[in-house]
Each structure stands twice: as C-alpha cells, then as structure tokens.
Amino acid sequence: MTIKSDKWIRRMAQEHGMIEPFVERQVRGADDSRVISYGVSSYGYDVRCAAEFKVFTNIHSAVVDPKNFDEKSFVDINSDVCIIPPNSFALARTVEYFRIPRDVLTICLGKSTYARCGIIVNVTPLEPEWEGHVTLEFSNTTNLPAKIYANEGVAQMLFLQSDEACEVSYKDRGGKYQGQRGVTLPKA
C-alpha cells in the first residue's frame, strides 16, 4: 500500500467526488482570525467538524452498552463551539462527505493541536467503497471542560492505495454505516 499525495487527493476529489465539499489548499486563517487548519496537505486531507454535536451525559444513570445504546445518553448541541465536560466525550461529524475508492483504505488521525490539550479524536478506518459523513468521537481526557471548534480542522485523513482491489468492499457487504448522514449513533 502506498500513501497518496496532494495531487492524487485533489484529482480524486475534483474528478470523482471523493471529498465534498473539497478545499484544495491548506486554510490557516479566515477573516483575519486564526483557525485550526483544514484542507489538503502534502499527504492527507484535514477535515472539519460540522456544527452538530452530541455530548455524552449520564443524567439517567444508564449503562453504556454498544449493543443497546440509549439515545437519551446524549444532549444535542448545534453551535460553532462545543464544550465537552471533564472526562467525557462528544460525537460530531465531518463537514465533508466521503466516497472511498474500492482500492483505498483511509486512516484518520487526530490533529496535534487538540491532542496537546488532552482532546483525542477517534475514527475507525474508512473502508473501500464506504461513503458518508464521518462520525467523529472526541474524548476529553482532562479534568477540565474542553472546547471543540466547528468548521475548523479536527483530524487528518490519510489515503492508502493497495496494489489490487479487494474482493469484498464495505459496500458489497452492505455495511451498516454505508451512506450515513449526520452524527450516527452505534448500531449493533
């Protein structure tokens, strides 16, 4: 597998709709203010977080069960910022919609700006022929409230292309998160 460059990412986004909307350069500032960078980079694409959050709360004293997840465990927030309580987490989604080619696996890594503040971003790999908005999980590992900024960079996608296409893709398997839009909760 080889990691793909900015030229390949740009071509796949513009000619094949791999990333929509696509920002073809690295954005570091907007309207004379600093932002956490997003857009294409040398060997990846920095995604933005949409202004749609689900913040975990345990007001119902529920047990977290991935096979039977209780939607009431989250508070919905639509805002340019999201405050995550200490030692808690929030779900969000990317601004960008992805269409992954059949011979590509995409790995997501959190941005160091957030990691250096104790905020960890987790996303499982985007499998061949998966498409949708990426659901992002932010863990606040600190004992203080933590802030996430919508419409700014939160994670980097790395695109790894295989020397041959897989026999069975995520789409072929009828993956349960195929075509997801918005923040998607666990499905068992």
Curated annotation (Swiss-Prot):
Protein name, UniProt field: dCTP deaminase
Reaction(s) this enzyme catalyzes, per UniProt: dCTP + H2O + H(+) = dUTP + NH4(+)
HAMAP family with a match to the protein in the record: dCTP_deaminase
Taxonomic lineage from the root: Bacteria, Pseudomonadati, Pseudomonadota, Gammaproteobacteria, Pseudomonadales
Gene from which the chain derives: dcd
Family: Belongs to the dCTP deaminase family.
InterPro entries: dCTP_deaminase, dUTPase-like_sf, dUTPase_trimeric
CDD domains listed in its UniProt record: trimeric_dUTPase
Residues engaged in binding dCTP: 111-116, 135-137, 156, 170, 180
Pathway info: Pyrimidine metabolism; dUMP biosynthesis; dUMP from dCTP (dUTP route): step 1/2
Domain of life of the organism encoding this protein: Bacteria
Active-site residue list: 137 (proton donor/acceptor)
EC number, as in UniProt: 3.5.4.13
SUBUNIT field: Homotrimer.
A Pfam family reported for this protein in Swiss-Prot or TrEMBL: DCD
Key words, A-Z: Hydrolase, Nucleotide metabolism, Nucleotide-binding
Single GO MF annotation: dCTP deaminase activity
ATP-binding among keywords: no
Keyword Transmembrane part of the UniProt annotation: no
GO BP term, example: dUTP biosynthetic process
Function noted in UniProt: Catalyzes the deamination of dCTP to dUTP.
